[in-house]
Amino acid sequence: MDTPPNVLSQQITDAVSKKGPVVRIGINEVAVTDTSLARTLYASFLKWPEWYESPKEKLFYGEPSLFGMTQPKEHSARRRILSNVFSKSLRSSTHVQNVTREILVERMIRQAQIPSGRSVVRDVRPVHEAFDMDFLTAFAFTPAFSTQFLNESDKFSEFRSWLRELRGGSPDAAKEAKCKLENWCLDMCRAYRASLTPTHQRISHCTADALYGAGLQESEVAAELLDHFITAKKNLAVVHTYSVYMLSIYTEVQERLRSELRSLSLDKLSIDDLASLPFFSAVISEVMRTHTEIKALTPRLVPAGGYWIPQRISGQSTFLPAGTVVSSAREALHLNEEIFPQPLSFWPERWLESADPKLAGKAQPQEMQNHLWYFGSGTHGCVAREYALYGETKLQFYMESAEL
């Protein structure tokens, strides 16, 4: 039986503390936990087909999404389309501003309001998952065609049950859940496409618009979007939930954050305004460092000719023959004591220029960002990095400014 990703990630983290930044974890497989080396390898090595490729019957609609594409030409073409959607300019996009106003302000904040004088115990994970789905489907299709999971808890519960069956149900139950998810996403795609008129003008940073505009078939569009929805539902909600959890525990961090946020106004607030707040940015970086949801190792293959790992990395030159599987565990990278002293401690101050040198590690705060490998790197790194940071930043601001 294969070792679960979370267990393997922890085993690698433990091994690194004893053996160094290059650890052999199989007959022809090594794990590297030096960030600069990982970036080099992930930028130049190919995906390992046996890990990424799925049988056609397991693919949504029988079509591969960007993540599962192993052929460079095919992957590059799809990535170009999505890179334009998820570029930094989304921060000033009118479409994204409309999505933020509708999903975050009109739906999320109202959902989170608690009557004055009442104390309420609430499971925030489902709320954050519902928010992420509403936000991402609105981003993909515009708010008019998004899910309404924040307001329709019964439909969201049904959606979550499909995902549970897909991942952990019997073969028959998983097959049925896959069919229901495909129909659900395809219905949204068709509804959005039916709304397009002959004079329709492309909407900047609207995912469905970009995919249809590039000439993709409806099944290809639906497969790509469904992969986005399922991935974001799991990963972003973890960051959001742990943000609330850690701030509830570390009340002094919460108070300092709110004090900084009070310097801004909700009116005409831009993402750049938030990015200029040092402690706000530090909190987000520390949450992503300490709570890495992505445990899978995303392996790569050493190409023909092999590769020499420099002596400066592991103390001796190490040759990796062609065909060697190379992986990196984000958790191990984020718990590197040389870069992040007391790595198990939640300490946002480490990211500030004014940090105590004894606790800041070898890297300066700006350099530390290079060691934050939450989104991976290279041509196969997370294409939606800017979207994820935007969503996390906006949600964190509204939750804290509203003192929820």
Curated annotation (Swiss-Prot):
What is this protein for, i.e. what is its function? Cytochrome P450 monooxygenase; part of the cluster that mediates the biosynthesis of a highly modified cyclo-arginine-tryptophan dipeptide (cRW). The first step of the pathway is perfornmed by the arginine-containing cyclodipeptide synthase (RCPDS) avaA that acts as the scaffold-generating enzyme and is responsible for formation of the cyclo-Arg-Trp (cRW) diketopiperazine. AvaB then acts as a multifunctional flavoenzyme that is responsible for generating the cyclo-Arg-formylkynurenine DKP, which can be deformylated by avaC.
What gene name does this entry carry? avaI
**Hey, which pathway is this one from?**
Secondary metabolite biosynthesis
Family in the record: Belongs to the cytochrome P450 family.
* Oxidoreductase listed as a keyword: yes
Q: Which organism is it from?
A: Aspergillus versicolor
Name this protein carries in UniProt: Cytochrome P450 monooxygenase avaI
List required co-factors.
heme
Chain sites annotated for binding heme:
382
Keywords annotated in UniProt:
Heme, Iron, Metal-binding, Monooxygenase, Oxidoreductase
Molecular-function GO terms, alphabetical: heme binding; iron ion binding; monooxygenase activity; oxidoreductase activity, acting on paired donors, with incorporation or reduction of molecular oxygen
The record lists the lineage as: Eukaryota, Fungi, Dikarya, Ascomycota, Pezizomycotina
Which processes are annotated in GO (biological process)?
A: secondary metabolite biosynthetic process
Q: Which InterPro entries match?
A: Cyt_P450, Cyt_P450_CS, Cyt_P450_E_grp-IV, Cyt_P450_sf, Cytochrome_P450_monoxygenase
